[in-house]
Amino acid sequence: MKRLLLSFLFVIAFGSCAFEEGEDELCFVGDSITYLWDLEYYFPNYIVSKHAVSGAGLKQMDSWDVSDCKGRTTILLIGTNDIGYWKSTADGIEHLREEYKDRFIKSAKRIEASPLIVLSILPRNAWGEQDPAVNENIEIQNEILKRALKTEIPGSRFVDVFDMFLDSGFEIREDLFKDGLHPNDEGYEILSQKIQGGL
């Protein structure tokens, strides 16, 4: 019932820019957050391709055949499995962030999307066991990726949803997650709305 109500509100709020039948195709690339995303439900008027594996990071993504995303609008959401345990206080963290930025840009370019839409890495508290310093680092990494995408992949878009999933003190909004890592229906509704706003 809650999901039906959310869908109704989604239509009311965004009906003026609703998708048109056969308007376009979308390609989604990511980890378990994308894998669990019911894309056919949230984007019913699009032809959707999904490349997503639970536990995946950039290394795994680089081995995938994403040639069907070339020249297509592609939404990339990945990174939590790569940097989800890095704390802002860790030794050498600045070097790690720069190195990760370079790897991320290289992997994103390989998709050859047009345009590429990158969703920010979400805050997390996997199974209620993580230090909020992890989210402080994710926030900084997102800003680094945002700046790099602007210069390294012209025409790409960075959709920042980090703050929408964050509570005070770098704690996550528990009401938007199932397990501190994967969004629940309300969380996926937010992601879908933000993507629609960027199309």
Model-derived features with residue positions:
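Positively charged n-region of N-terminal signal peptides that target proteins for export
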Residues: 1-4
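Serine-esterase "nucleophile elbow" of acetyl-processing enzymes
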Residues: 7, 16-75
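Repetitive helical segments and hydrophobic/amphipathic motifs
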Residues: 11-12
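Alpha-helical cap/lid subdomain in secreted, periplasmic
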Residues: 43, 47, 62-199
